Amino acid sequence: MTLQMIQKKYLQFFLKALFFLLASIAFSKFSFADESIIDQDHKLPEDYEAQWERLVSDVEPKLLGGGGSIDPHLEILKQSQFPSAALCGRCHQRIFNEWASSNHAYASISPMFHKFEQAVNALTSGTMGSFCVRCHQQVGTQIGEPRESPLWERSLVAREGITCITCHRVNQSFFKVNGERHVQPGSIYEPVYNTGDAPGVAEVIAERDFYKISTSPEEEGFPIHGGAKVFETIGQSEFCVSCHQVAVNIGIKLEVVWEQYRDSPAFRKGVTCQDCHMGKIPGEAKGYDTGPVAIVNGRVVGDVNRKHSNHAFYGPGYPIAHPGLFPFNVRALKWSVKEWLTFNYREPWGMPDWEDQLEQGIVDRPEFPEIWSTRKVREEARYIIGQNENLLENKRLDRLAVMENGSRIDGPFFDKGSPEVGKDLSFRYRVTNVDEGHNLPSGSLGAQPEIWLNVVLTDPDGERVFESGYVDKYGDMVDLHSIELAEGTIEHDDQLFNLQTKFLTTNLKGTD
């Protein structure tokens, strides 16, 4: 018997309990040692409440740039007016786990973004201002955090990048504004904006004692938003264009994802950004998964067959941040950004077998930073990194799926018939973009994925007799931009197949 066949009202509670059991199993793919980033299966850590309360308390923002006083321009803005994703994740565990390793969650953390942003501001003598951070750190920009503030001086919600409220507290269409949108301030108790009116919220509020929730600071229980208001644009491609079509000046475009999409077969077929980037299959419009919108205090809320939009936001992003800082992990907030950066995760710190050998004197003791001087602390940090590495593996699989579902390689094709011993060989491959929504590759010209073809021909002994697509000692393709080529220590790759888009400059500087 399927869930769809069970109609009788007296079985609804049983179905919810059954789904919760199944959901607990399904969510385990996001876990390390069978425990989720946020414990939704009654395995709450002893300091669970303390962890959450510390995250969402009314802490005044510190004076950015140093000092212990309060910036007068920020004093009126409590952190609770811009709730953290950690608070949303208490009820929306599945969505939180998907978002935690997404490119949206990575937007503020990305070391590559920070280097690129610093370079652009230096090259423009600072005239770019907050142009980049108003997308990557929108809430931080809105509350007045200086552009140049490092991560360890920013508010938690700014470090979360494109966090829950960045989308679900926006209530008007902005269209092409290069990230200049406005997030509605408000505590966790204020309504959120979604494609529907969320009847599940009304159900929970009506049975607040059963779900043990609160809708105001005066009440006890899990704090939740007091409702959901319909904002249809959030489910349309036009919502995405505010950040994914970027012009740095008149006629100079840094990102043209929207224009590619508007000129695509996908657009003509009515396929939206959400259909491919939040659907069931990464990069393909093949419908959506299903599931309840929330699990509140272990109790399933709403229709278990409800459409589920995947908040992993599938894309080709490749994170290189410290795995203690990304993916977003509530337990990791026990330590500061600076402290995490001193944890050498590339070494076996915190791994039980290695820690045993360390105690037995079998391996030499490193000079641990004071914060990581005890085994217990190192093992706790390693546990968190293990959780995050599982999330990163899921992200890797999604990334591969996006690329494989959007492109195809055929060949080799031999131009002179079948190869013969002792004769020259001519062959080729055909690379096809089968993605109906974007060019290949797509994304920001500064940060888009580099796609090139690495072709190697080996002899019967395994020796390379021909190669194209090799890289120099700096990891760069050997085109005219290769530093090693300019140094004269490597040969130019004459047959390089490279889909990377080069920057264009015009007028006085000429073209490239």
List PLM regions with ranges.
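N-terminal secretory signal peptides that target proteins for export/translocation
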Residues: 1-13
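N-terminal compositionally biased, intrinsically disordered segments and leader/signal-like regions
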Residues: 3, 18, 506-507
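Primarily the internal scaffold of c-type cytochrome electron-transfer domains
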Residues: 34-79, 95-124, 128, 145-512
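An acidic-aromatic substrate-binding cleft motif
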Residues: 81-85
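Low-complexity, highly charged intrinsically disordered N-terminal segments
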Residues: 89-90
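Outer-membrane beta-barrel channel domains
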Residues: 131-138, 168-170
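Conserved, well-structured interaction surfaces
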Residues: 138-145
